[in-house]
């Protein structure tokens, strides 16, 4: 490894993360890292002797079941959530979803995540310049589709 010097505030992304040639993935990663820079500047400003305090605590993503998460898991969730909201704005995604599945309005409860909905997710992902999974998770965050788990 070679040591390099960059100006303060520079965001470095390992080339292997974006070498796949997937422009959508690269765009999401860059947006995710920019939100780390904005939301968590102290977490990534390392000085000698500075430790990372990490513990599990209750965190309630999207108002659903509680999950024990470490501080690192929480800040990753926050950066992912903000990147998704930035690239796939709520109002635009809702409108595009309703148009794609030919509904008259926003569903009162999430639609069941079933195979027939996959082409719609793919179409929306392409329209918003993201991959399938980030779009699927965004639709779940917005309560437009469920998570596919059956009781």
PLM feature segments, named:
Residues 1-151:
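Active-site hotspot residues in diverse enzymes, especially metal/ion-binding acidic/histidine motifs
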């Amino acid at each position: 490894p070679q040591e390099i010097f960059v100006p303060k505030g520079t965001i470095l992304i390992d080339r292997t993360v974006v070498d796949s040639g997937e422009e959508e993935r690269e765009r999401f990663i860059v947006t995710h890292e920019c939100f780390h820079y904005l939301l968590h500047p102290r977490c990534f400003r390392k000085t000698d002797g500075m430790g990372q305090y990490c513990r599990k605590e209750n965190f309630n993503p999207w108002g659903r079941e509680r999950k024990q998460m470490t501080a690192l898991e929480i800040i990753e969730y926050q950066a992912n959530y903000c990147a998704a909201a930035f690239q796939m704005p709520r109002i635009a995604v809702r409108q595009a979803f309703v148009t794609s599945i030919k509904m008259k309005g926003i569903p009162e409860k999430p639609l069941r995540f079933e195979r027939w909905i996959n082409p719609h997710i793919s179409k929306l992902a392409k329209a918003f310049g993201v991959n399938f999974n980030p779009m699927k998770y965004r639709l779940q965050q917005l309560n437009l589709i469920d998570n596919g788990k059956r009781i």
